[in-house]
């Protein structure tokens, strides 16, 4: 039955749990079906303290999976299922199969033991990453020592679940080291959310206002990575925007236009912070350019690509 708890208790101190819930909230997840267990207790407890979330309970994981499936099909929004470690995850396989072929946006969240404990005769342990096989569009296991990487994996999973058609189930595995039951966080972090937008071809005018992308205020820089010589429209487009934006082009970009600056010609130690970074093309080779943006992260990063890859 659904419950709407009040804000009266602390959230888990585990950074990956907080990051997961923050990213899911940004991607529109509202309903969670919670299953019993000890390793997943800090996830379930935290869900029940957040006003934006609605918690439902089911004692059997197989039933929980199909309960969430029905909710996702009825609401056309992603629904999450939270289970503990070990064979509890395997009980979600029937619902994963059904969701995969019905293109239902389900998010299977499994708590896990630390990776070093797997295969060491510890209770309720098994290899959980990829346990749902080909019946999920994406399966990720969050690294415990790299929050930025965990955030990227979470966003990629949610984009695969709801934005990359057809929709379908994904699996997020969260290894949780001791202390498991430590609760001292007052609120969710403002985690980075990655959006996927389909835009009109460059030669077409957007049909409505929603198709227009609005740049944030501040300094915008366009960086061009490796391109194929066949992408002949790029120089023309750059010529149109060069009056308003600075353009930096790698040698591998093959963009013979005077409107572009080679990154080797820039003193990156004196470069001012950029508010919006727009990238297109493939690999960036220049080391100073990459180090600058890793140290001085822009407020927004737009990556333009045919397949909407996260970079």
Name what the model sees in each region.
Residues 41, 62-65, 88-90, 113-118, ...:
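Short gly/pro/ser/thr-enriched loop/turn and capping motifs at secondary-structure boundaries
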Residues 82-84, 105-112, 133, 143, ...:
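Short beta-strand segments
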Residues 11, 156, 160-217:
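Conformationally flexible catalytic loops at phosphate/diphosphate-handling active centers
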Residues 41-115:
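Thiamine diphosphate
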Residues 38-40, 84-88, 112-114, 175-179, ...:
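Short glycine-rich anion-binding loops that position phosphate/pyrophosphate groups of nucleotides
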Residues 91, 224-306, 310:
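Glycine-rich, anion-gripping cofactor-binding loops and their flanking helix/strand elements
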Residues 19-29, 71-76, 158-166, 209-220, ...:
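Glycine-rich phosphate/diphosphate-binding loops that line cofactor/substrate pockets in enzymes
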Residues 124-168:
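Conserved thiamine diphosphate
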């Amino acid at each position: 039955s659904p419950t709407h708890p009040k804000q009266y208790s602390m959230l888990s101190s585990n950074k990956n749990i907080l990051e997961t819930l923050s990213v899911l909230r940004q991607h529109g997840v509202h309903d969670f079906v919670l299953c019993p267990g000890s390793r997943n207790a800090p996830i379930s407890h935290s869900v029940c303290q957040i006003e934006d979330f609605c918690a439902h309970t089911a004692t059997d994981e197989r039933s929980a999976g199909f309960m969430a499936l029905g909710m996702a099909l009825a609401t056309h929004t992603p629904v999450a299922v939270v289970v503990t470690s070990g064979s509890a995850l395997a009980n979600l396989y029937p619902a994963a199969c059904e969701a995969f072929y019905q293109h239902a946006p389900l998010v299977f969240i499994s708590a896990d033991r630390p990776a070093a404990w797997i295969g060491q005769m510890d209770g309720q342990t098994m290899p959980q990453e990829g346990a749902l096989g080909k019946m999920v569009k994406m399966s990720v296991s969050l690294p415990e020592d790299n929050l930025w990487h965990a955030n990227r994996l979470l966003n990629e999973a949610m984009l695969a679940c709801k934005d990359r058609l057809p929709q379908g189930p994904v699996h997020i595995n969260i290894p949780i080291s001791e202390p498991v039951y430590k609760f001292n966080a007052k609120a969710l972090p403002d985690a980075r959310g990655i959006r996927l937008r389909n835009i009109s071809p460059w030669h077409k005018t957007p049909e409505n206002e929603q198709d227009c992308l609005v740049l944030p205020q501040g300094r915008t820089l366009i960086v061009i990575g490796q391109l194929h010589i066949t992408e002949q429209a790029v120089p023309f487009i750059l010529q149109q925007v060069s009056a308003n934006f600075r353009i930096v082009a790698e040698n591998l970009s093959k963009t013979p236009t005077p409107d572009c600056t080679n990154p080797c010609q820039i003193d990156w130690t004196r470069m001012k912070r950029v508010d919006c970074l727009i990238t297109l093309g493939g690999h960036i080779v220049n080391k100073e350019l990459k180090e600058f943006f890793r140290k001085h992260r822009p407020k927004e990063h737009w990556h333009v690509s045919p397949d909407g890859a996260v970079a």
